[in-house]
Curated annotation (Swiss-Prot):
It comes from the Bacteria. One of its GO terms (molecular function) is glycine dehydrogenase (decarboxylating) activity. One of its GO terms (biological process) is glycine decarboxylation via glycine cleavage system. It holds the Pfam family GDC-P. The glycine cleavage system catalyzes the degradation of glycine. The P protein binds the alpha-amino group of glycine through its pyridoxal phosphate cofactor; CO(2) is released and the remaining methylamine moiety is then transferred to the lipoamide cofactor of the H protein. It catalyses: N(6)-[(R)-lipoyl]-L-lysyl-[glycine-cleavage complex H protein] + glycine + H(+) = N(6)-[(R)-S(8)-aminomethyldihydrolipoyl]-L-lysyl-[glycine-cleavage complex H protein] + CO2. The gene is gcvPA. The glycine cleavage system is composed of four proteins: P, T, L and H. In this organism, the P 'protein' is a heterodimer of two subunits. The lineage of its organism: Bacteria, Bacillati, Bacillota, Bacilli, Bacillales. It is an enzyme of class 1 (oxidoreductase). This is Probable glycine dehydrogenase (decarboxylating) subunit 1. Its EC number is 1.4.4.2. Keywords: Oxidoreductase.
Amino acid sequence: MLHRYLPMTEEDKQEMLKTIGVASIDDLFADIPEQVRFRGELKVKPAKSEPELWKELAALAEKNASVKQYVSFLGAGVYDHYIPAVVDHVLSRSEFYTAYTPYQPEISQGELQAIFEFQTMVCELTGMDVANSSMYDGGTALAEAVLLSAAHTKRKKVLISTAVHPQYREVVRTYAKGQKLEVKEIPYDGGITDLKALEAEMGDDVACVVVQYPNFFGQIEPLKAIAPLAHEKKSLFVVASNPLALGVLTPPGAFGADIVVGDMQPFGIPTQFGGPHCGYFAVKAPLMRKIPGRLVGQTTDEDGRRGFVLTLQAREQHIRRDKATSNICSNQALNALAASVALSALGKRGVKEMAAMNIQKAHYAKVELEKRGLSSPFAGPFFNEFVIRLGRPVSDVNDRLLEKGIIGGYDLGADYPELAGHMLVAVTELRTKEEIDRFVNELGDGHA
């Protein structure tokens, strides 16, 4: 352009037309018949000033039920958690905000170290040996775990509990279809995976057993009992886990999990319409070379200084193309950084306290709802979500709650016909006693 800081000028247009040998812009469209060419002005609104545009967009945004204006008891994979103020401050730094895959370590040490710290934190939470730099979200991380299991065992059958998040299971089925894998769903009993049904399906053709911890109903799966069933047949044991729950629960790695995946949304990532999120993927050492996605390793340079580099890159698509272990590329480095900053701000003690608050407040809510005559079909231990039985359609109850400034729980009947009229309630550390009591009063006030 002739003028560096000005948009397209008439001089620019004439210079471009002259360069390509065309007299006018109309000549560029000469191959379009005259009778079908548009003439006149497009019916679009005139341009707005910046203040006018802000007002219009704000009015549109106010039509949404935001957790900033409403009290949310909705979870089902996306939760309203505390985000330390420092998270947005660090994310807004230009070297992180616009960074891409750090192929050149000599100019990317900051980003590489941030990713390395993320990997380290994931390993500490899950009790695993190696974690990658992130996945797109929990669902795609689980699907990649299934593909890894099939490739490693050279088997085609996948056993997955119906107590795993319905959308996670749908993503797994989508990935499995292209690989011609058989996905067999194991029913739940009492809110957790039916161990007898699982044992009956186990065979030498099973690539992996997949459960969620805590599961979709918030219940704590008995990993200690499930792992031997998988390993007895030399199948891999895959666990999808809420990382916040691992602040108080025994990590899956301690029970013998081969692959642990999940979604880092509880740490530093807002609800934001359900995405983008940040999946995590961790494995035991024998599977290290088959893990999908980027891996950052720590090394020393020729002067003995500590440095960070992308390692084991022969697994990746920019090296091996069609032979790569995964086609995930840019991953979710910025959201992984958000999770890392949030975890760093909280510290180990803070994560434990945050998880404990979720447990305490969720159990308080359940006890109070039971006092009002509501009941749960499941009696096992749970984390920060639980199921309650309503006497009316959940959609009707949620519409009424919304009028009262409350976002109600998830309608389980949408995915589990046998649980029609049941609500999945999530209670996080942000919910106050007054908010929980108001929710209980609204549900107990003729909604049960």
